[in-house]
Curated annotation (Swiss-Prot):
Listed EC numbers: 2.8.1.13
Gene that this sequence comes from: mnmA
Protein name: tRNA-specific 2-thiouridylase MnmA
Originating organism: Rhodococcus erythropolis (strain PR4 / NBRC 100887)
Region spans: Interaction with tRNA: 143-145
CDD domains per record: MnmA_TRMU-like (cd01998)
Reactions catalysed: S-sulfanyl-L-cysteinyl-[protein] + uridine(34) in tRNA + AH2 + ATP = 2-thiouridine(34) in tRNA + L-cysteinyl-[protein] + A + AMP + diphosphate + H(+)
Binding site residues for ATP: 6-13, 32, 125
Pfam families to which the protein is assigned, alphabetical: tRNA_Me_trans, tRNA_Me_trans_C, tRNA_Me_trans_M
Entry keywords, A to Z: ATP-binding, Cytoplasm, Disulfide bond, Nucleotide-binding, RNA-binding, Transferase, tRNA processing, tRNA-binding
Length: 370
């Protein structure tokens, strides 16, 4: 089988490529150039797409004895990931750019080019397991990345390979060292690759500008402070609110609601954050077909954490793919519009199975009667 190995310059993708070679596949390595602007992406050990990372990927390919190329996807990345990220925050949402990159860049733009060039699959260094079209959590629970892959369709999964999902991270590093890969001890990348400073608020402010609004007490309606734009806030945020002192009950204040139409950011105590029901749109089902009737499942709303028992049901909401109505058996906090909600079928033996996902469009704070 002809396999295109996406090589970020890190240890995970290098070992994924090595395993594809060891499995007897005809492997070609490729690094995605996602920006041409100096300093636009993180560099060194904290990045995944910098010139230094491209060099590390090339050296790993040389060790493996496979052809290697750098492909320019900068324009597509800006349009589908960066611009989408900015627009979502301007609308008071909280997007995850890693999901969008997987959905639009790695497993659409890259995969489409791979197929056009005669490749059968794209291999990446994601920590997840995929067998017969079924996507499951990785063996290494701490490194599991099935959440950021939950946006992939059945067709996209049919062209994907995740060679390292059955192995703990430390063993991957040991294997890299045994294979003579210089990236064996390279630190993991963190944060958002296209925000070099790590200051998301400043990054967004430079692109959205000042859109004044008010910070309002969620219970009393009292205006507590002014702000420069809703893009500086996310649900559950505690720091940087521009408000002195605790909430009326003496406890810390959190962002509990964002209203982009009026520029209002509501803050209150933690009790205002509980969510018992979630509405999601643009549903994606990994099997290619929506389930019939209610489904008992676990839902996850963040890459790390935000997990709860639930009952989910596909609904016709007029959006592409339809919607998902989710009733929680226990409350979640910090649930924001724009986040992805990923549904899992628990399986302690084989690993939790990803059923599908949707983009959160609304929440309800009243307990349900399941």
């Amino acid at each position: 089988m002809r396999v295109l190995a996406a090589m970020s310059g890190g240890v995970d993708s290098a070992v994924a490529a090595a395993r594809a070679v060891a499995a007897g596949h005809d492997v070609v390595g490729v690094h995605l150039a996602l920006s041409t602007a100096p300093g636009a992406l993180r560099t060194g050990s904290r990045g995944c797409c910098s010139k230094e990372d491209a060099g590390d990927a090339r050296r790993a390919a040389d060790v493996l004895g496979i052809p290697f190329y750098v492909w320019d996807f900068a324009d597509r990345f800006k349009e589908d990931v960066i611009d989408d990220f900015v627009a979502s925050y301007a609308a008071g949402e909280t997007p995850n750019p890693c999901l969008r990159c997987n959905e639009k860049i790695k497993f659409t733009a890259l995969a489409d080019r791979a197929v056009a060039l005669g490749f059968d699959a794209v291999a990446t260094g994601h920590y997840a397991r995929l067998e017969d079209g079924v996507l499951r959590r990785a063996v290494d629970a701490d490194k599991d990345q099935s959440y950021v892959l939950g946006v992939l369709t059945a067709d996209q999964l049919s062209r994907a390979m995740f060679p390292i999902g059955d192995t703990p991270k430390e063993q991957i590093r040991e294997e890299a060292a045994e294979r003579g890969l210089a990236v064996a001890n390279k630190p993991d990348s963190h944060d958002i690759c296209f925000i070099p400073t790590g200051d998301t608020r400043a990054f967004l402010g430079a692109r959205i500008g000042v859109r004044p609004g008010s910070v309002v007490d969620a219970d009393s309606g009292e205006v507590l402070a002014a702000h420069d734009g809703v893009h500086g806030f996310t649900i559950g945020q505690r720091k940087g609110l521009g408000v002195e002192g605790p909430a009326g009950d003496g406890r810390p204040r959190y962002v509990t609601a964002i209203e982009p139409e009026t520029g209002t950011v509501r803050v209150g105590s933690a009790k205002n954050l509980d969510v018992w029901a979630i509405s999601a749109q643009r549903a994606i089902w990994t099997s290619g077909q929506a389930p019939e009737g209610p489904v008992e499942c676990m839902v996850q709303v963040r890459a790390h954490g935000g997990l709860a028992q639930a009952v989910a049901e596909a609904v016709d909401d007029g959006t592409s793919g339809g919607g998902i109505s989710i009733s929680l058996r226990e409350p979640l906090t910090g649930v924001a519009k724009g986040q992805a909600v990923v549904l899992y079928r628990p399986d302690s033996e084989l690993g939790d199975q990803v059923l599908g996902s949707g983009t959160i469009s609304g929440t309800e704070s009243e307990p349900n009667t399941l």
